[in-house]
C-alpha cells in the first residue's frame, strides 16, 4: 500500500501542474498586453482617459501607458519611429504620414467639428460676428499690422481647417494675415496675454478662455470652418494591429463605451477626465461645460468621417501640406470597429 506523506503529495501536485502546463490546449492566464498610447491634451481624447480611469483596459488584460504630445505632427513622428503604439490625434497628420510611407491606420473616430476660431481685443471688435476679407484688410490698415492668428504646426488639423476657413470661406488674402504655429498650451496663454489676436482652439480651452475672459468671442464654429470637420481619430501602427488583434478589438470596444458614457453622463465623465486634462487643478464643472459646448461632438464610427476626410486630404495637397494624396479608405482599417459593434 502506497503511503502519501505531505512531501510526496506536494511533489505529486507540482508534477501534475507541470504536466498540465505542458499539455497543448491548456488554458493559462495570459500576460497583459502592454500598449503605449500617445495623445494630444484636448477634450477629444476623453474616451482614452475614461477607458484608463475606469479600468476597462485593465479588465480586458491590457496595460496602458499614456504619453502626452503638444501637437499631432510631433506625435506622428514618434509613432512612425515606433516609440508609441496607438495615438489619439487629428486625422490630417495621420494621412500625411501615410503619404510618406508610414504604415499607420485609423481604427476608430473620436470627435468631429471640434476646432473653433476665437478672438479677443481690438481684432474681435473689428471683424465682428461675421468676418469678411474686407474686415481683415481694414484692421491691418487701421492698426498698421496684420492680425496674428495662432494655430498648430503645418499639416495639423488646426492649421488645415484654419486655412480652409480663411482662404476658402472668408476668402482672406494670405498677405493680410499672419499665422503663428505653436503648441496647444502656448496658444491659450498667448491669446489671453494679448500676444495673439485670434487662435484655433479646442475644448476645454474654449471654455477655459471664455471663463477667464468673457470678451473672448467665437468667430467661427467647427462646422463653419470646414463642414463635417474631421477631427480626432484613434490610429495604430500596422505591426501592433497584427500582433495584438484581440487586444485592439477590446480597446476599440472600450472606446465606444466611453463615447456613449460621455453622451449619457457628462458630469460623471468630467470628473474622470479632470484627473488627466485638469491635473486636479481645473473644476470638473468646467469640463462638464466643455462637454456641452459647441466644440464637443463625439463620434466613434470611423465610417461616418470618410467623405469629409477625403475633402480635407485634397485640401492638404492644395495648400502644400501633403505632396500627394492617397485613397483615404486605405488609411482606415474598419475591421476592429465593425467587430466591436457586433
Language model segments and positions:
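Pocket-lining segment of extracytoplasmic ligand-binding domains
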Residues: 186-276
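Ligand-binding "clamshell"
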Residues: 31, 97-107, 167, 208-223, ...
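Secondary-structure end/capping motifs
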Residues: 242-323
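A conserved helix-loop-strand patch within extracytoplasmic ligand-binding domains
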Residues: 103, 110-180, 185, 238
Amino acid at each position: 500500500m502506497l503511503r502519501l506523506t505531505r512531501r510526496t503529495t506536494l511533489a505529486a501536485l507540482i508534477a501534475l501542474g507541470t504536466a498540465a502546463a505542458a499539455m497543448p490546449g491548456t488554458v493559462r492566464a495570459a500576460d497583459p498586453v502592454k500598449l503605449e498610447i500617445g495623445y494630444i491634451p484636448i477634450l477629444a481624447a476623453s474616451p482614452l482617459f475614461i477607458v484608463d480611469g475606469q479600468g476597462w483596459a485593465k479588465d480586458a488584460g491590457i496595460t496602458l501607458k499614456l504619453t502626452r504630445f503638444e501637437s499631432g505632427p510631433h506625435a506622428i513622428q514618434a509613432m512612425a519611429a515606433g516609440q508609441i503604439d496607438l495615438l489619439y490625434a487629428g486625422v490630417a497628420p495621420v494621412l500625411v504620414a501615410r503619404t510618406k510611407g508610414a504604415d499607420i491606420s485609423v481604427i476608430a473616430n473620436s470627435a468631429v467639428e471640434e476646432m473653433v476660431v476665437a478672438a479677443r481685443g481690438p481684432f474681435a471688435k473689428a471683424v465682428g460676428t461675421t468676418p469678411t476679407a474686407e474686415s481683415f484688410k481694414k484692421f491691418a490698415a487701421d492698426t498698421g499690422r496684420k492680425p496674428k492668428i495662432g494655430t498648430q504646426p503645418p499639416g495639423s488639423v488646426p492649421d488645415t481647417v484654419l486655412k480652409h476657413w480663411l482662404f476658402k470661406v472668408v476668402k482672406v488674402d494670405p498677405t493680410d494675415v499672419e499665422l503663428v504655429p505653436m503648441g496647444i498650451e502656448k496658444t491659450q496663454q498667448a491669446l489671453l496675454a494679448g500676444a495673439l489676436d485670434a487662435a484655433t482652439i479646442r475644448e476645454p480651452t474654449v471654455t477655459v478662455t471664455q471663463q477667464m475672459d468673457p470678451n473672448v468671442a467665437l468667430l467661427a464654429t467647427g462646422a463653419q470652418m470646414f463642414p463635417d470637420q474631421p477631427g480626432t481619430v484613434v490610429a495604430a501602427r500596422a505591426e501592433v494591429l497584427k500582433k495584438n488583434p484581440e487586444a485592439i478589438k477590446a480597446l476599440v470596444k472600450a472606446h465606444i463605451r466611453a463615447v456613449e458614457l460621455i453622451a449619457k453622463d457628462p458630469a460623471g465623465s468630467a470628473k474622470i477626465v479632470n484627473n488627466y486634462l485638469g491635473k486636479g487643478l481645473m473644476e470638473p464643472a468646467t469640463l462638464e461645460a466643455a462637454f456641452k459646448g459647441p466644440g464637443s461632438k463625439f463620434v466613434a464610427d470611423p465610417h461616418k468621417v470618410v467623405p469629409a476626410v477625403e475633402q480635407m486630404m485634397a485640401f492638404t495637397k492644395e495648400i502644400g501640406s501633403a505632396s500627394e494624396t492617397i485613397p483615404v479608405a486605405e488609411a482606415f482599417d474598419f475591421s476592429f470597429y465593425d467587430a466591436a459593434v457586433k
